[in-house]
UniProtKB/Swiss-Prot annotation:
Residues 1757-1776 are annotated as: AC 1. Belongs to the peptidase S8 family. A motif (Cell attachment site) lies at residues 521-523. Residues 1788-1809 are annotated as: AC 2. The active site is at D173 (charge relay system), H214 (charge relay system), S388 (charge relay system). GO terms for molecular function: endopeptidase activity; peptidase activity; peptide binding; serine-type endopeptidase activity. This is Proprotein convertase subtilisin/kexin type 5. Its EC number is 3.4.21.-. Pfam families: Furin-like_2, GF_recep_IV, P_proprotein, Peptidase_S8, S8_pro-domain. It comes from Rattus norvegicus. Serine endoprotease that processes various proproteins by cleavage at paired basic amino acids, recognizing the RXXX[KR]R consensus motif. Likely functions in the constitutive and regulated secretory pathways. Plays an essential role in pregnancy establishment by proteolytic activation of a number of important factors such as BMP2, CALD1 and alpha-integrins. May be responsible for the maturation of gastrointestinal peptides. May be involved in the cellular proliferation of adrenal cortex via the activation of growth factors.
Length: 1809
């Protein structure tokens, strides 16, 4: 690198020290990235140019002029300020900022800007010496001479007459060589200037390295002159080209602003191929002036149409840079262009980001072709590269489009690019189709630009609607970004729908403003997901970005949501992936973020905008499904997605038929696609159908057919649905985006092993749920087991598992002992109610209590003195007395001791701790230190730091430490060691277990074998093996010589049953099976005839007996086959000319080469003689041949006498009664390949005879065992015992509780801790409050705690409009309070309005004229105090009924004092009053309806409540006057029996005729889901779905099913007799009109005057005098005239007669209503029925039965409608006329019309009137 100023500094004559300092500064400055200030200022001055001149002159500045097109912004220069300085300028000139007219001033800072080509020295480059037009490969893709697969169709635009004429493009760079022969003709001086040199000449500075070639190269791509025989051709070769020289000097904000705003009314397009450093660590963008210049340009440039800014996306690919950190390409005002190589692959330098709009060609690897263009010194180059080459190419294409339509706005240009760019052959793994149908990628934006398509679109373009900008509210909720995790924030955007000037409905750009603090910015990745599910990567990890600055209000931008709807949930995700370079542990924080939505409020593409794309010169489809191609312009091939049937035009919507799939748009356009886009699934008829709204992928359109979910939703794998909140028993697995199941016993959890709440009957032990066992038991993992006999409570088996001890035992160091050991004392302070033994002080041998002052005896050599052990007088500390009485030194580890060894210590030095007589430096791992002593850890811990199970620091073998709770939890079964992160990932296995892929197995899994306690994988395609050989192969492969092959060797065939290669018959060369007639080729000399190898003369010798006398050998068939085959080949060849040949030596007689009989001792098998029958055959003595065993049999002793079945993993067969079956029949189970009998009472079983799967008869299944009844808290559902719901005491269904456990309450069939709002608890049930109450103590209107209507007030439980007299309203709680006793009317507790007699109002208080004693009252007549009656304590007059209060032992009843309250009152001992009972109570214990002790006549008592009608689940017992419980199967009932039900609970159905509730309706009935009843099928139906005649699913005898109707097989009055086709018809019983069989109990229809009794199919008369009710052989026609209902029994009749008059009246009213209904019905019959658009179906072949009911008397229309998302609705409307003729109305046309589903759409739902 040439440092320039450094070399100038060190010229001869300079001081050496100065040179050194200058060079040092030059080296350090780039490293430190210090700001470099210039002597140029940008100033905003109001008042015009003259005022700016005046102020500049006043402070020593030179006013260079206005900054570009920025009004009131001026460029000031100060010659006396250092040209470059690391310090901002100070001096008198800085006082300019105090001038009133100076609104803003900024000293300019040098900005690092990099040209976006790449250094050719990095890669070997290829030079071409003759750069001519034919070599410009990127313009010739369509001529088949270049390998590029997709054309930018530039020639197509030229052929339409567009070459860029009158369009002005300027290149913002290091200047352009305006004198270049290829540029001078198109050079435009008005579009050119030199910002660096402050003049108008853009000529570059020349030097030896040609450093400033960049701008000239870019200019040639755009507008190099055509046909001048010099060098190359520009894309817009008639456009005007200019240049702004601005990169060859200090680049400041002012320099950039001047450049991008230069002559904006003349320049149309600005092209820039530079930006901040692409080093993977810079975050930089335009400063304030440049941002202002961009905004002014799009607002006012091109006379209000807006300047077009084209920008190269960046070359930081090698540095893992991300162009989202470049504020120029990240701007909505710039068109960011990326590059692709000739092959369509990603170039190595390419950055990816969500702001890239489109792509053009450039170079790729060093060996790839590069771009040909103009170069400095009037030369050409074929080495132009990088995204620098792509941006000018795009500028040239845009120039062609602007020539086609000069009125395109800056936004129109972007829309045209979006709609015409295409993916083509561009290679990226992130292509996706957004919800608007646009295909988009982070590498290439919307794809390769298409010049011809753009000019065609521009020709007919209509300006898009006005841009709206919606700034959504900022989310300032601070969220911590933890390492290796993600932060997710969801914002519900409205698109500013409440503000019409800012409402954004259809999106263009989306900007996300983010503030994040973070210790290493490069570790962050940020994603944004739109409401439609499109996910944009706003930022990727950057390896070299070590900055700790984070992002402060940085704007990320995405175009991936273009065309989508704005409103909905936007999901921001921030991921932190810590790199190894990160040293700081402080987590990052998402401080705030907000959305800025740009777009339109209305659809931007009106019908006039739906212009055709051109395909004339390209051969790959334009991937924009929203376009409408014009057939009149079509002249090319069909779209690749059309099938060979053909097309009507070039587009994917012109196909006659699709090759792969299609989907429809709301404009009825069908688009052909290679695969269904995200959010769709492959349906029938090649149709792509929409998934449910929350599904990302699916297998059907319903909400329960999802395969994966959109962001913000999680897949519930059990229901295949996407949910925002995972259901109970599962947790949100953010990594997999699914609802992960909690472990078996968890109710709620945060991970599989982290329970937060347990199911009923279990308790949380750390993070695991265990069964709550009774005291004296522990949970073993399966059930509760008894503790050791010493333990009162325990955590595990054995004496070591005790927590507390039984009576007579005490706890000592984790064990239960009968008495304390030596050196322990009994601690009487109870811990949890239990005593324990504590260790004595070290100095004591025995003791009575804690500390050194409670010793009771001392070690040898110590004397007991006042409870303390003192050293004997003769020895010192550190010594002990030996047996001779001499002092000896203790072991060095002891401070005091009683013996010589290290185990004899009694106290320790300060550096050691005491451990069972030893002084150690540290406690062993299984103990912890407390008060300088070692204590044992909890028995579950291997190491610990405290006594409890949660203080473990290390765990035993086979356990791991739970990171959240610190407890030791068991590893996966078989693991000796496992990791905390994954307890299933074993580090070693227990004895008897095999290790395979970090898991321990008792037996090695499939396709592995065990070797040295490891499972090793079998060979390729092997299904089972050992270390020596493979035993069988995967499906499609055959075992051959120990390995698995797809094709067997010649002479062998693949046996599908055995999975092995077996030898062919010896007569075959190759074959397809074992038989002689399964040859596929023959040995030489024989010919193939229908699978058999025969002599050519076979017809002449067939049947001849050959050479019977030849002696027989005893060959081995399998062994001899290869040798025999070789012998035969020689023999056949040798004797081919002979007419007759001898049989094979093994045959007795033969036909050709095939034996037909065998000598004695051998047997015929497959036309060969064998010494014994092979496996799979049996010897037939009758035929002396081997017969094949039955199919699937491996060995047998005869036909149907199988002894062993074939068995393969994919096809296991089981032996049962001499035959082989795929599964055992009912009552048998598989054991060792044989079906064995299940043990009674098992109906079916599995695994062993007693492991039942279903039970016989009335037995029920519970955990694999059949019982007569289910255990407590279980219920039988379809023969299986199901556990009642949680907290349930008794239930009738696994989801329907009938009685709760204590302290729980029944609500909606489940048990709850408390009742919901507006319910009160009573008898373990939640009972609804009265409608007036908001909360209550009972069901009545005077049981309220608060009022539902806020305008009401509460008084004594009643909600009233106003407080009654003698009370006032308490405004705090809206209750009525009693006035003071002297007040008659008051407005508050302190304000009386009127007083009782004898009192007057004085200052709002009622006072007596004179203060009387407590037992006196003021007598108005005598004007003095008089005594109260003796029964009163206080009073208002002399009589006994004028009391206010009463003496003790008496109670105030109204105004009288009584000793006992009468019936209907209860005694309130606090107020000494008799308070009325509730109106429903006869006697009570309180005022509420729930405090009754007995009830009034006519009321029923339920607990302490009196009811006129018993609540659900109870019936009124009139004898006792109580509500008694119904049978638990009933919801309501009339008695205690299961046959007294009147309605049923959920999941049950009422059979009214029997009064029973059934889980499933009996035969001949169907379940009416709405009424929850079992209703009788039509008499002809055996099974049905409804009561109508056409709802049959199957028929009774003598009828057959025809379109849901059971049609008789005989004429009316006869029934079928006999099976098969030859049957007779016999007459029905005389009482039947139609029947299903003989006798009077098989009627299906009745003659006139008779009614059908459904239950026994009899036809009976109505009951009358001759048929009294008692006969049971007549119908109660008063109840029904449609069917026969038998009269009630005498007892029932008597019971009915006791009913109240209310029921009689109700019945009369019902009859009147029925009569009125009949009249209305009769009238309706006379009205005409509209029959438009109905077609009559074919005449039925048989007549309907004479059974008719009212539902057939009217025309019926039945409409089926599928309300789910987008399903085909092809059901027709069925219509039945009065004559029984069936019609069908078709929803989509006439009966004979072809299927047409044109009314179906995938993007919206429509309803039709």
């Amino acid at each position: 690198m040439d440092w320039g100023w450094g070399s100038r500094c060190c010229r001869p004559g300079r001081r050496d020290l100065l040179c050194v300092l200058a060079l040092l500064a030059g080296c350090l400055l780039p490293v430190c990235r210090t700001r470099v200030y210039t002597n140029h200022w940008a100033v905003k001055i109001a008042g015009g140019f003259a005022e700016a001149d005046r102020i500049a002159s006043k402070y020593g500045f030179i006013n260079v002029g206005q900054i570009g097109a920025l009004k009131d912004y001026y460029h000031f220069y100060h010659s006396r300020t250092i040209k470059r300085s690391v310090l901002s300028s100070r001096g008198t000139h800085s006082f300019i900022s105090m001038e009133p007219k100076v609104e803003w001033i900024q000293q300019q800072v040098v900005k690092k800007r990099t040209k976006r080509d790449y250094d050719l020295s990095r890669a070997q480059s290829t030079y071409f010496n003759d750069p001519k037009w034919p070599s410009m490969w990127y313009m010739h893709c369509s001529d088949n001479t270049h390998p590029c697969q997709s054309d930018m169709n530039i020639e197509g635009a030229w052929k339409r007459g567009y070459t860029g004429k009158n369009i002005v493009v300027t290149i913002l760079d290091d200047g352009i060589e305006r004198t270049h022969p290829d540029l001078m003709q198109n050079y435009d001086a008005l579009a050119s200037c030199d910002v660096n040199g402050n003049d108008l000449d853009p000529m570059p500075r020349y030097d030896a390295s040609n450093e400033n070639k960049h701008g000239t190269r870019c200019a040639g791509e755009v507008a190099a002159t055509a046909n001048n025989s010099h060098c190359t051709v520009g894309i817009a070769f008639n456009a005007k080209i200019g240049g702004v020289r601005m990169l060859d000097g200090d680049v400041t904000d002012m320099v950039e602003a001047k450049s991008v705003s230069y002559n904006p009314q003349h320049v149309h397009i600005y092209s820039a191929s530079w930006g901040p450093d692409d080093d993977g660590k810079t975050v930089d963008g335009p400063a304030p002036l440049t941002r202002q210049a961009f905004e002014n340009g799009v607002r006012m440039g091109r006379r209000g149409l807006g300047s077009v800014f084209v920008w190269a996306s960046g070359n930081g690919g090698r540095s893992k840079d991300h162009c989202s950190c470049d504020g120029y390409t990240n701007s909505i005002y710039t068109i960011s262009i990326s590059s692709t190589a000739e092959s369509g692959k990603k170039p190595w330098y390419l950055e990816e980001c969500s702001s890239t709009l489109a792509t053009t060609y450039s170079s790729g690897e060093s060996y790839d072709k590069k771009i040909i263009t103009t170069d400095l010194r009037q030369r050409c180059t074929d080495n132009h590269t990088g995204t620098s080459a792509s941006a000018p190419m795009a500028a040239g294409i845009i120039a062609l489009a602007l020539e086609a339509n000069p009125f395109l706005t800056w936004r129109d240009v972007q829309h045209v690019i979006v709609r015409t760019s295409r993916a083509g052959h561009l290679n990226a793994n992130d292509w996706k189709t957004n919800a608007a149908g646009f295909k988009v990628s982070h590498l290439y934006g919307f794809g390769l630009m298409d010049a011809e398509a753009m000019v065609m679109e521009a020709e007919k373009w209509t300006t898009v609607p006005q841009q709206h900008v919606c700034v959504e509210s900022t989310d300032r909720q601070i969220k911590t970004i933890r390492p290796n995790s993600a932060v997710r924030s969801i914002y519900k955007a409205s698109g500013c729908s409440d503000n019409p000037n800012h409402h954004v409905n259809y999106l263009e750009h989306v900007v996300v403003r983010i503030t994040i603090t973070h210790p290493r910015r490069g570790d962050l990745a940020i994603y944004l997901t739109s409401p439609s599910g499109t996910r944009s990567q706003l930022l990727a990890n950057r390896l070299f970005d070590h900055s700790m600055e984070g992002f402060k209000n940085w704007e990320f931008m995405t175009i991936h949501c273009w065309g989508e709807r704005a409103a909905g949930d936007w999901v921001l995700e921030v991921y932190d992936t810590p790199s190894q370079l990160r040293n700081f542990k402080t987590p990052g924080k998402l401080k705030e973020w907000s959305l800025v939505l740009y777009g339109t409020s209305v659809q931007p593409y009106s019908p006039t905008n739906e212009f055709p794309k051109v395909e004339r010169f390209r051969y790959s489809r334009v991937e924009d499904p929203t376009d409408d191609y014009g057939a009149e312009d079509y002249a090319g091939p069909c779209d690749p997605e059309c099938s060979e049937v053909g097309c009507d035009g070039p587009g994917p919507d012109h196909c006659t038929d699709c090759l792969h799939y299609h989907y429809k748009l709301k404009n009825n356009t069908r688009i052909c696609v290679s695969s269904c886009p995200p959010g769709h699934f492959h349906a029938d008829k090649k149709r792509c159908r929409k998934c449910a709204p929350n599904c990302e992928s699916c297998f059907g359109s319903h909400a329960d057919q999802c395969l994966s979910c959109k962001y913000g939703y999680f897949l519930n794998e059990e229901t295949s649905s996407c949910v925002a909140q995972c259901p109970e028993g599962s947790y949100q697995d953010i990594k997999k985006n699914i609802c992960g199941k909690c472990s078996e016993n968890c109710k709620t959890c945060t991970g599989f092993h982290n329970c937060t709440e347990c199911k009923g009957g279990l308790s949380l032990q750390g993070s695991r749920c265990s069964v709550t066992c009774e005291d004296g038991q522990f949970f073993s993992g399966h059930d509760c087991q008894p503790c050791h006999r010493f333990c009162a409570t325990c955590a595990g088996a054995g004496a070591d598992g005790c927590i507390n001890c039984t009576e007579g035992y005490v706890m000592e160091e984790g064990r239960c002992v009968q008495s304390c050991s030596v050196s322990y004392y009994l601690d009487h302070s109870l811990e949890g109610g239990y005593k324990s033994c504590k260790r004595c002080d070290n100095s004591c041998l025995t003791c009575n209590g804690p500390g050194f002052k409670n010793c009771s005896s001392c070690p040898s050599g110590y004397l007991l003195d006042l409870g303390m052990c003192q050293m004997g007088a003769i020895c010192k500390d550190g010594e002990y007395i030996d047996e001779q009485g001499h002092c000896q030194i203790c072991d060095a580890s002891c401070a005091k001791c009683w013996g010589p060894t290290q185990d004899d210590c009694i106290s320790c030095p300060i550096t050691r701790v005491f451990d069972d007589g030893r002084c150690v430096m540290n406690c062993p791992s299984w103990k912890f230190e407390l008060k300088k002593q070692c204590h044992p850890c909890h028995h579950t811990c291997q190491g610990c730091q405290g006594s409890g199970p949660s203080n473990c620091t290390s765990c035993k073998a086979g356990e791991f430490q739970d990171s959240e709770y610190g407890e030791c939890m068991p590893c996966e079964e078989g693991c000796v060691g496992c990791t905390v992160d994954d307890p299933g990932a074993c580090t070693s296995c227990a004895t008897g277990y095999y290790m395979f892929e970090r898991h321990c197995y008792k037996a090695c899994p499939e396709k592995t074998f065990g070797e040295k306690w490891e499972c090793k994988a079998c060979g390729t395609n092997c299904g089972s093996c050992d270390q020596h050989e493979c035993y069988w192969c995967e499906e499609g492969f055959f075992l051959s010589s120990g390995s698995c092959v797809q094709d067997c060797d010649p002479g062998f065939y693949g046996d599908q049953e055995l999975g092995e290669c077996k030898p062919c018959h010896r007569a075959c060369e190759t074959c397809t099976g074992l038989g002689y007639n399964q040859c596929s080729s023959c040995p030489e000399g024989l010919q193939l005839w229908h699978g058999t190898c025969i002599w050519p003369t076979w017809p002449h010798v067939e049947g001849k007996v050959w050479n019977e006398a030849v002696p027989t050998e005893k060959p081995s068939l399998v062994r001899s086959l290869p040798q025999d085959r070789r012998k035969w080949k020689v023999q056949i060849k040798r004797d081919a000319t002979r007419q007759y040949q001898p049989c094979h030596s093994s045959c007795k007689t033969c036909n050709g080469s095939l034996c037909t009989s065998c000598p004695a001792g051998t047997y015929l098998w497959l036309q060969a003689c064998v010494p014994s029958c092979p496996q799979g055959t049996w010897l037939s003595v009758r035929s002396s041949s081997c017969e094949k065993c039955a199919e699937g049999c491996a060995s047998c002793s005869g036909d149907d006498l199988c002894q062993r079945c074939l068995s393969q993993p994919s096809n296991t067969l089981l032996l049962h009664e001499g035959r082989c079956y795929h599964s055992c029949p009912e009552g048998f189970y598989a054991k060792d390949g044989v079906c064995e009998h299940c043990s009674s009472p098992c109906k079916t079983c599995k695994g062993n005879a007693t492991s039942c799967h279903s039970c016989e008869g009335d037995f029920v299944l519970d955990h694999g065992v059949c019982w007569e009844t289910c255990p407590e808290k279980h219920v039988a559902v379809e023969g299986v015992c199901k556990h009642c719901p949680e907290r349930c005491q008794d239930c009738i269904h696994e989801k329907t509780c009938k009685e709760c456990m204590p302290d729980f309450f029944l609500y909606n069939d489940m048990c709850h801790h408390s009742c919901p709002k507006n319910f009160y608890p009573d008898m373990r049930q939640c009972v609804p409050c009265h409608k007036n109450c908001l909360g209550c103590n009972g069901p009545k209107e005077d049981d309220c705690k608060a009022c539902a209507d806020t305008s009401k007030v509460l008084h004594n439980g009643l909600c009233l409009d106003e407080c009654p007299k003698g009370t006032y309203k308490d405004e705090v709680n809206d209750e009525c309070r009693d006035c003071p006793e002297s007040c008659l009317i008051c407005s508050s507790a302190w304000t009386c309005l009127t007083c009782r007699e004898g009192f007057t109002v004085v200052q709002d208080v009622c006072t007596a004229p004179k203060e009387c004693a407590a037992i006196e009252y003021w007598d108005v007549g005598s004007h003095r105090c008089q005594p109260c009656h003796r029964k009163c304590s206080r009073c208002s007059g002399p009589s006994e009924n004028q009391c206010y209060t009463c003496p003790r032992e008496t109670f105030l009843l109204n105004t009288t004092c009584v000793k006992e309250c009468p019936e209907g009152y209860h005694t309130d001992k606090d107020s000494h009053q008799c308070v009325p009972c509730h109106s429903s109570c006869r006697t009570c214990e309180g005022p509420h309806s729930m405090q009754c002790l007995s009830c009034r006549p006519g009321w029923f008592q339920l607990g302490k409540e009196c009811l006129l009608q018993c609540r659900d689940g109870y019936y009124g017992e009139s004898t006792s006057g109580r509500c008694e419980k119904c049978d638990k199967s009933c919801k309501t009932c009339r008695g205690p029996q299961p046959t007294d039900c009147q309605s049923c609970d959920t999941f049950f159905f009422l059979l009214r005729s029997k009064g029973q509730c059934h889980l499933a309706c009996p035969e001949h009935y169907y379940a009416d889901q709405h009424a929850q009843t079992c209703e009788r099928c039509h008499p002809t139906c055996d099974k049905c779905s409804g009561k109508e005649a056409w709802n049959c699913l199957s028929c009774v005898w003598s009828y057959h099913l025809l379109k849901g109707i059971c049609t008789p097989e005989c004429i009316v009055g006869e029934y079928r007799d006999g099976k098969g086709e030859n049957f007779n018809c016999k007459k029905c019983h005389e009482s039947c009109m139609e029947c299903k069989g003989p006798g009077s109990k098989n009627c299906t229809g009745c003659s006139a005057g008779l009614l059908l009794q459904m239950d026994d199919s009899r036809c009976l008369r109505c009951c009358n005098a001759s048929h009294p009710h008692r006969s049971q052989d007549c119908c109660d026609c008063q109840s029904s005239t449609d069917e026969c209902i038998l009269p009630a029994s005498d007892d029932t009749v008597f019971h009915e007669h006791t009913k109240t008059a209310l029921l009689v009246t109700s019945g009369a009213m019902l009859l009147l209503l029925l009569g009125a209904a009949v009249v209305v019905w009769r009238k309706s019959r006379s009205q005409p029925v509209a029959k438009g658009r109905y077609e009559k179906l074919a005449e039925p072949t048989v007549s309907y039965s004479s059974y008719r009911s009212s539902y057939l008397d009217e025309d019926q229309v039945i409409e089926y409608r599928d309300r789910d998302y987008d399903e085909d609705d092809e059901d027709d409307i069925v219509y039945m006329g009065q004559d029984g003729t069936v019609y069908r109305k078709f929803k989509y046309g006439l009966l004979d019309e072809a299927e047409d589903d044109e009314l179906e759409y995938d993007d919206e739902s429509y309803s039709y009137q």
